[in-house]
Amino acid sequence: MNLNFMPLLHAYNHASIDFHFNSSARDFCVHEVPLYEFSNTGEHAVIQVRKSGLSTLEMLHIFSQILGVKIAELGYAGLKDKNALTTQFISLPKKYAPLLEKNTSNFQERNLKVLSLNYHHNKIKLGHLKGNRFFMRFKKMTPLNAQKTKQVLEQIAQFGMPNYFGSQRFGKFNDNHKEGLKILQNKTKFAHQKLNAFLISSYQSYLFNSLLSKRLEISKIISDFSVKENLEFFKQKNLSVNSNALKALKNQAHPFKILEGDVMCHYPYGKFFDALKLEKESERFLKKEAVPTGLLDGKKALYAKNLSLEIEKEFQHNLLSSHAKTLGSRRFFWVFAENVTSQYIKEKAQFELGFYLPKGSYASALLKEIKHEKGENNDEF
């Protein structure tokens, strides 16, 4: 497989929309939504922290230096963007709580502010968040492009958007996935096991994005061409599907087609299950009740069946499925932005956008779907 970045297909067919977005603390904000309410009792202090110009790991090092707490004792649910104003929840042993207020000025000097203090029985673990609320400000936006942007947002509100991994997974030079494959091939290895695991997960992410783009291509072909033309296309690709099945696929109301053998998942969380009645599952997909999923290949992965598996096989890798430390999983192919708000400020030529996404989903995927930038090979942040 070619490991160079290729343009990922968009869900919708509008022309590119020209505007400027700068990933900065002024124009990009991320607010973490916790998975559960904190009990206000327990051995772990839980603080809500606001940061700017810092990665989450840099923030943890600052807390370690100022408070004397070991980094391993700090809990966090996920990594937040460096080039943004972000809030997230951090847990630390209760004994360090009295030091927080005493070091307010020290935190402020490092672009950190503790917004609230609570307590809980458990340490916060990776993945212990519901999702994130985002704010983005687009600049140099004309009234016509603002109107186009609102039309795209209406489509996204109705049908959702592709759940692509963002560029954070692939590094500054878009090569993390290549290093991950080299680790699997025993061509390279780093001293820190967490770095090795992250790079391998970048390779998983690259394969997922490629599979999702391929599925979008197939969905568009099914929608845009006749049954006869589709039969010829699938025949050329050595994919087995008959005319009756193609007619049923064309009749699915959602632009992303659910195929025979797809693995579905209840949305926004729940169990995986096989898509047995495609018409029924397509209706549930349209109602945002269940979503088709894509493969994150690895040990004990759950694979698709039938036609979906025939397509998925191209994006499997035996080195992932046999690697003892790399567990396989599945990820939503599609997600739905919620609580979408927008405002166009004509005199400033600015467009302000707010929305919520479930955990693991990237604001850059929504930006990509709006902007449709020509010649893009990855996201802007």
Swiss-Prot record:
Highest taxon, organism lineage: Bacteria
GO CC term (a single one): cytosol
GO BP terms, alphabetized: tRNA pseudouridine synthesis
UniProt keywords, alphabetically: Isomerase, tRNA processing
Enzyme class: isomerase
Pfam families per UniProt: TruD
Residues of the TRUD domain: 160-335
Keyword Isomerase tagged: yes
Coiled-coil annotated spans: none
PROSITE patterns: TRUD, UPF0024
Function: Responsible for synthesis of pseudouridine from uracil-13 in transfer RNAs.
HAMAP family in UniProt: TruD
Family: Belongs to the pseudouridine synthase TruD family.
Entry protein name: tRNA pseudouridine synthase D
Lineage summary: Bacteria, Pseudomonadati, Campylobacterota, Epsilonproteobacteria, Campylobacterales
